[in-house]
Amino acid sequence: ASTSNYCNQMMKSRNLTQNRCKPVNTFVHESLADVQAVCSQKNVACKNGQTNCYQSYSTMSITDCRETGSSKYPN
């Protein structure tokens, strides 16, 4: 339940409930410097076949917020 509350709060506070709902929104719980540092690390193929993804050398804390069957725009 706490992840659900976090997702609802973050989606509203960042105005991510405008126009349409994306199936997944990912929030990274790391410093901006740590996130930016990933871009200078190993370039790898993305899951969708594109080549503009990067592999972090360290584990990062994230929260994936997924649209549920009961999700309703704009909430």
UniProtKB/Swiss-Prot annotation:
The keyword Membrane does not apply. Its EC number is 4.6.1.18. The keyword Lipid metabolism does not apply. It is an enzyme of class 4 (lyase). This is Ribonuclease pancreatic. Keywords: Disulfide bond, Endonuclease, Glycoprotein, Hydrolase, Lyase, Nuclease, Secreted. It comes from Oryx leucoryx. Disulfide bonds join 7-65, 46-53. One of its GO terms (biological process) is defense response to Gram-positive bacterium. Pancreas. GO terms for molecular function: lyase activity; nucleic acid binding; ribonuclease A activity. The gene is rnase1. It catalyses: an [RNA] containing cytidine + H2O = an [RNA]-3'-cytidine-3'-phosphate + a 5'-hydroxy-ribonucleotide-3'-[RNA]; an [RNA] containing uridine + H2O = an [RNA]-3'-uridine-3'-phosphate + a 5'-hydroxy-ribonucleotide-3'-[RNA]. SMART domains: RNAse_Pc (SM00092). Glycans are attached at residue 15. Substrate binds at residues 22-26, 47, 66. It comes from the Eukaryota. Endonuclease that catalyzes the cleavage of RNA on the 3' side of pyrimidine nucleotides. Acts on single-stranded and double-stranded RNA. Belongs to the pancreatic ribonuclease family. It is found in: Secreted. One of its GO terms (cellular component) is extracellular region. Monomer. Interacts with and forms tight 1:1 complexes with RNH1. Dimerization of two such complexes may occur. Interaction with RNH1 inhibits this protein.
